[in-house]
Design a protein with these regions (language model features):
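Conserved pre-catalytic core of RNA-dependent polymerases
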Residues: 1-2
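Short, charged amphipathic recognition helices of the HTH superfamily
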Residues: 5-15
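RNase H-like nuclease fold core
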Residues: 14, 18-126, 130, 134-138
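Short, surface-exposed amphipathic charged segments that create phosphate/polyanion-binding patches used
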Residues: 70-71, 154-156
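Inter-helix linker motif
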Residues: 136-154
């Protein structure tokens, strides 16, 4: 919440509303001061050079922002290493994805060491396929089977 621009008193009120817990501004400040460097380090950590599969998708949430309920998306990249170990490569909060957005995400993965992705499993998000083809041109792109079933069911 702090990283997204909420001030400590807003976070305090949010925690009170959601969980019924009372925390002071100073407690929120101390927690964020300790957590932010750890989160930043995780977001910038080096990644494997090759992933067998990378899943790219979004989860949509309704959240309260400035007194209104708005829809936000958390975009996520989960990789499966060549030895089968799963790894959350990153999570990004946004309102809508675009080719430019996905290019920045994929270039960020490349800058963190990902040189090749064998298969990208995607959920049909706007601009994602074009961004993958631009950054990782040899990657096979496979639409997620769940998304295929949902899309097909609309026509049955």
């Amino acid at each position: 919440m702090y990283a997204k621009g909420m001030i400590t008193s807003d976070i305090e009120a949010h925690i009170q509303e959601l969980y019924g817990l009372s925390v002071s501004d100073s407690t929120v400040s101390r927690v964020t001061d300790k957590i932010l460097p750890v989160v930043k380090e995780w977001q910038q950590r080096p990644l494997e050079s090759v992933y067998a599969v990378v899943f790219l998708d979004a989860i949509h949430f309704h959240v309260r922002s400035e007194g209104q309920i708005v829809k936000k998306a958390v975009y996520i990249a989960i990789g499966i290493q060549m030895d089968g170990i799963r790894d959350v490569l990153g999570m990004w909060v946004g309102e809508n994805g675009s080719a430019k957005f996905w290019l920045s995400i994929l270039n960020g993965l490349r800058n963190r060491g990902v040189q090749d992705i064998l298969i990208a499993c995607v959920g049909g998000l706007t601009g994602l396929t074009n961004a993958i083809e631009a950054v990782y041109p040899r990657t096979e792109i496979q639409q997620c089977i769940i998304h295929q079933i949902r899309n097909t069911a609309r026509f049955v």
